[in-house]
């Protein structure tokens, strides 16, 4: 790894992603300094064996130790060896900042006079699986515990509920995995309501010796969130057996569905009767970084108000302890038809649809370009009944939009954090004009994407066949029509671009000056984008590349001169021979636009 010292001037150490250090000697000689997480799996004794067998030099080990100690000294770890608890702040300035960040990241994709909301509306239907419980943050390592969560339904009720009659329906479920047990319906014992009793047994020598117990309630029990961290992580973990138990009292009669999967073996019992066997015959699944078993489900016809004894048995086998336990009771109403009835009764509909942290997370890819479950059907049906429908997309990435031709307004909100609902309410009511721009291209079909022809590859290896044509450059070069291009984003006002002037400055700098005027009636911000096109057409190089942008806030009828400065790197290419950036002389075009496709101004010059 000479590049880290010679090219990057980097004097830190290299750490693996969690569980990614799959080899011993190859990683050691390839520049890895630290395998994570502990305890060591492919290093430790195996690395010592590599040194003893002369496959890894002691000098290599010394260099790794030296780099780790250097960082420890640099961060003053030796002066303060104690592990301090994590901390964060929750105060008014930070809440305001989080709300502003959420607002400015939301992208208005389409608007045919439904937004901002008409203040004279008498009734609004808020429909969709993400309206009451939105996804505010991604799954896996992206997940953080927030101080509070603001969701669209509650935020809109708080903002306009006194003047507008609001009706709500979930419309449909979007589970990838069945939800957590209803905490109000379970109890470990009379003194421990709302939780499972979790018992750990040591099965060595043929017995079941209770070694620890705790009370917990969640659907996903795994080591990365503290499950069994002081028990199964020890050397005796192959002998550990875990039992989850509780009394469950349904509040509805009917077919209940249950689900389990784990890293290891698991089974699900009700009143001693086995409902799910994921123990005797397991298959690989995609959960827990594709280390767990495939999901298995079972059903039971349960009676309202009758108490049942639930027991889940788990035997750890694998990289780290993890098990998922889900339960879905039958719906008390027909959610789909309830939503359609509301759509008939109201002046306007706000639909909040999307994904969740099970669909969009680290460790596995989405398997479908569509919205999960019945959401596309729900959108179509609601719009057919009430064309005055605003669609809010609560997703972390692009989705297929088969209904886009008939929906009038669409907002892409992403996973906007703990102020999500409040930020969305400000956008919808017009307190804030949207100003976000797409950081990626939204394709029409999955077949249009650059990775489609090479994904998923073979034996976990995939070639990046698009080479330099990453992202919007692929669609640009291949002349592929997009649903919404990179950089796209509307406002409640209009902006006029004019007077592009290009000047060469000293130190290989290029000045791009132009004027933007707010020609509408709303105050708003515009993100102008500067693309550079080298006027030499080749099959392998992009048509143009984004090299600068500017965000400008303008009051109605206000105009400002914008200047974007481009440096030498904007006109350079990486030289494999020189191992450095090399300025390419010749003819260039500067394009100024509101997106990668919506180019407003262009000018040519020679460098």
Named regions from a protein language model:
Residues 1-2:
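Short, small-residue-biased leader/transition segments that mark boundaries at the very start
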Residues 260-265, 270-272, 521-538, 544-546:
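Short acidic, flexible loop segments centered on an aromatic residue
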Residues 565-594:
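Short, surface-exposed ligand- or partner-binding patches at beta-edge/loop junctions that are enriched
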Residues 39-42, 49-51, 55-138, 144-217, ...:
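Secreted, periplasmic, or luminal enzymes acting at the cell surface/secretory milieu
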Residues 252, 264, 318, 432, ...:
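Short, acidic/polar linear motifs in exposed loop/turn regions
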Residues 10-39:
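Short acidic/histidine-rich active-site segments
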Residues 538-576:
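Intrinsically disordered, low-complexity Pro/Gly/Ser/Thr-rich segments with frequent PxxP/GP/PP motifs
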Residues 173-348, 357, 363-366, 370-377, ...:
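Acidic/polar, compositionally biased interaction segments
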């Amino acid at each position: 790894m000479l590049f880290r010292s010679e090219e990057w001037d980097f004097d830190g150490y290299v750490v693996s992603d969690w569980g990614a250090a799959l080899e011993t000697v190859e990683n050691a000689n390839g520049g890895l300094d630290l395998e994570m997480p502990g305890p060591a799996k492919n290093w430790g004794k195996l690395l010592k064996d590599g040194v003893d067998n002369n496959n890894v030099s002691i000098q290599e080990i010394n260099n790794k130790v030296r780099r780790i100690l250097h960082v420890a000294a640099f961060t003053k770890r030796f002066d303060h060896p104690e592990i301090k608890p994590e901390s964060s702040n929750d105060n008014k300035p930070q809440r305001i900042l989080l709300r502003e960040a959420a607002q400015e990241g939301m992208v208005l994709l389409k608007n045919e006079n439904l937004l901002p909301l008409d203040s004279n509306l008498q009734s609004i239907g808020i429909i969709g699986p993400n309206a009451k419980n939105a996804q505010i943050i991604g799954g896996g390592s992206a997940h953080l515990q927030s101080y509070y969560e603001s969701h669209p339904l509650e935020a809109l009720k708080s903002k306009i509920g006194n003047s507008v009659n609001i009706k709500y329906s979930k419309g449909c479920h979007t589970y990838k995995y069945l939800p957590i047990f209803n905490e109000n319906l379970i109890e470990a014992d009379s003194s421990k309501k709302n939780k499972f009793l979790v018992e750990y047994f040591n099965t060595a020598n043929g017995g079941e010796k209770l070694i620890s117990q705790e009370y917990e309630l969640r659907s996903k029990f795994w080591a990365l969130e503290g499950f069994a961290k002081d028990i199964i992580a020890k050397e005796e973990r192959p002998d550990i057996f875990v039992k989850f138990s509780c009394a469950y009292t349904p509040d509805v009669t009917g077919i209940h569905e249950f689900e389990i999967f784990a890293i290891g073996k698991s089974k699900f019992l009700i009143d001693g009767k086995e409902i799910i066997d994921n123990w005797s015959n397991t298959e690989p699944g995609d959960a827990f970084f594709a280390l767990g078993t495939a999901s298995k489900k079972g059903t039971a016809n349960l009676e309202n108000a009758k108490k049942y004894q639930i027991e889940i048995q788990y035997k750890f086998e694998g990289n780290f302890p993890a098990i998922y336990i889900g339960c879905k009771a039958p719906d008390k109403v027909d959610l789909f038809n309830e939503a359609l009835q509301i759509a008939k009764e109201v002046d306007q509909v706000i639909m909040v649809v999307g994904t969740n942290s099970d669909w969009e997370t680290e460790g596995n890819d989405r398997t479908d370009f569509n919205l999960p479950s019945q959401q596309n059907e729900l959108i179509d049906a609601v719009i057919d009944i009430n064309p005055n429908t605003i669609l809010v997309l609560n997703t972390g990435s692009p989705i297929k939009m088969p209904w886009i031709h008939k929906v009038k307004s669409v907002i892409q909100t992403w996973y906007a954090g703990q102020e999500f609902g409040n930020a969305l309410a400000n956008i919808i009511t017009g307190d804030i004009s949207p100003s976000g721009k797409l950081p990626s291209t939204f394709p029409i079909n999955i077949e249009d994407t650059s990775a489609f022809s090479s994904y998923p590859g073979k034996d976990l290896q995939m070639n990046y066949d698009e080479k330099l044509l990453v992202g919007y450059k692929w669609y640009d070069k291949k002349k592929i029509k997009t649903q919404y291009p990179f950089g796209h984003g509307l406002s409640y006002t209009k902006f006029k671009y004019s007077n592009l002037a290009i000047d060469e400055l000293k130190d290989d700098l290029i000045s791009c000056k132009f004027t933007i005027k707010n020609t509408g009636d709303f105050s708003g911000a515009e993100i102008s984008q500067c693309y550079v096109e080298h006027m030499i057409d080749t099959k392998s190089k992009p048509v143009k590349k984004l090299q600068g942008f500017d965000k400008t806030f303008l009051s109605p009828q206000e105009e400002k001169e914008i200047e974007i400065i481009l440096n030498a790197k904007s006109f350079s290419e990486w030289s494999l021979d020189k191992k450095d950036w090399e300025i390419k002389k010749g003819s260039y075009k500067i394009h100024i636009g509101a997106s990668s496709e919506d180019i407003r101004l262009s000018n040519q010059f020679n460098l």
